[in-house]
């Protein structure tokens, strides 16, 4: 089994870290204290470079997401709004971001935000049981709601787009993952993934080109892998639970991340970071580490690509971001 080794630990907040996202060398983080902090991640250098205006939101920052290949950031808050931030062009090359827009529409806390691969759709989800899809242009200044999806029966915890297709997955307190697709400008639910026996906190798509698989993490302490099998005559998609990953977690699984390297990482209430590898069609534990944030729960995990190296980042209730390397056993 490989080892998981701590590279760097950054104490960013006094309260819990809910979410972060990485793009173009910058890790954006969101916390209960309403602040969004940006960390420059380069080689072995991890530096806090900006703290965004905390007056933009009245409550916790629950989710942050970079628009692909840009310096535009979306942040969803418990105050039911979404803020959009853009990098300010400065002569002295300092990194600063300005508030570009506030998006309103949800009736309750926004739990998740996610950009489509082309950057023209922004999906948001909420405690109000709905998923909203917003359309924007290249500037990212104006947002039009083109669809409100209300088929979940409970709080929607998380949204994620397929890495190359206009396919959206939403995870919910109703124990399901729903798959959404655009048919002639009409977004429809094309599949309901049933199997988890508790809240589904998050999901992530396989990054392999041309492949349609999804992993999900739940209150039932399991991580599952789902596979798309095809469409039926009514254009509904058939997804099957291809695997339940080895039993590592003893409590809720809050976040999962499927890396470009094919590995799946999971974290949760038990403080364990687990990494799984598929070998000849069977999933095995590649590495695991307990107490990654001491006695605190872990809310988020991400794969980071740095100059040809792949590392992991985790964020917990302790307000700390930890960066980890994976070392294969000799």
Curated annotation (Swiss-Prot):
InterPro entries, per the entry: CIAO1/Cia1, G-protein_beta_WD-40_rep, WD40/YVTN_repeat-like_dom_sf, WD40_repeat_dom_sf, WD40_rpt
Domain of life (superkingdom)? Eukaryota
Cystine pairings recorded for this chain? none
Q: Name one Pfam family in it.
A: WD40
PROSITE patterns in alphabetical order: WD_REPEATS_1 (PS00678), WD_REPEATS_2 (PS50082), WD_REPEATS_REGION (PS50294)
State where the protein is found.
Cytoplasm; Nucleus
Major location (coarse): cytoplasm
Keyword tags: Cytoplasm, Nucleus, Repeat, WD repeat
The biological process GO terms on file are: iron-sulfur cluster assembly
Q: Which GO terms describe its cellular component?
A: cytosolic [4Fe-4S] assembly targeting complex; nucleus
Q: Which SUPFAM superfamilies match?
A: WD40 repeat-like
Question: Which proteins does it associate with, and in what oligomeric form?
Answer: Interacts with NAR1.
Cross-referenced PANTHER family, in alphabetical order?
Answer: CYTOSOLIC IRON-SULFUR PROTEIN ASSEMBLY PROTEIN CIAO1-RELATED, WD40 PROTEIN CIAO1
Looking up HAMAP family in the UniProt record yields: ciao1
Q: What does this protein do?
A: Essential component of the cytosolic iron-sulfur (Fe/S) protein assembly machinery. Required for the maturation of extramitochondrial Fe/S proteins.
Similarity comment: Belongs to the WD repeat CIA1 family.
Protein name from the UniProt record:
Probable cytosolic iron-sulfur protein assembly protein 1
Native source species: Saccharomyces cerevisiae (strain YJM789) (Baker's yeast)
Q: What's the encoding gene here?
A: CIA1
């Amino acid at each position: 089994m490989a080892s998981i080794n701590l590279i760097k630990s950054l104490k960013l907040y006094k309260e819990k870290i809910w979410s972060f996202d990485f793009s173009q060398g910058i890790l954006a983080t969101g916390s209960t204290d309403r602040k969004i902090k940006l960390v420059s991640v380069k080689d072995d250098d991890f530096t806090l470079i900006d703290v965004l205006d905390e007056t933009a939101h009245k409550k916790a920052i629950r989710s942050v997401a970079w628009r692909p290949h840009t310096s535009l950031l979306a942040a969803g808050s418990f105050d039911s709004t979404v803020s959009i931030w853009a990098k300010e062009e400065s002569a002295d090359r300092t990194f600063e971001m300005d508030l570009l827009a506030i998006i309103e529409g949800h009736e309750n806390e926004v739990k998740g935000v996610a950009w489509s691969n082309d950057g023209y759709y922004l999906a948001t989800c909420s405690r109000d049981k709905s998923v909203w899809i917003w359309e924007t242009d290249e500037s990212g200044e104006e947002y039009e709601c083109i669809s409100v999806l209300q088929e979940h029966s409970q709080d929607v915890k998380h949204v994620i787009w397929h890495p190359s297709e206009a396919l959206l997955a939403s995870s919910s307190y109703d124990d399901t993952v729903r798959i959404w697709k655009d048919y002639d400008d009409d977004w429809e639910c094309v599949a309901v993934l049933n199997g988890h026996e508790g809240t589904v906190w998050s999901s992530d798509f396989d990054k392999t080109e041309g492949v349609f698989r999804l992993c999900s993490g739940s209150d039932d302490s399991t991580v599952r892998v789902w596979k798309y099998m095809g469409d039926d005559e009514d254009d509904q998609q058939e997804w099957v639970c291809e695997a339940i990953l080895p039993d590592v977690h003893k409590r809720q699984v809050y976040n999962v991340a499927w890396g470009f390297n094919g590995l799946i990482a999971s974290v949760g209430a038990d403080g364990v970071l687990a990494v799984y590898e598929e070998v000849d069609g069977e999933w095995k534990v590649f590495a695991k580490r307990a107490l990654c944030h001491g006695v605190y729960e872990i809310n988020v995990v991400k794969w980071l690509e740095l100059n040809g190296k792949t590392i992991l980042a985790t964020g917990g209730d302790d307000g700390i971001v930890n960066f980890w390397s994976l070392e294969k056993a000799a």
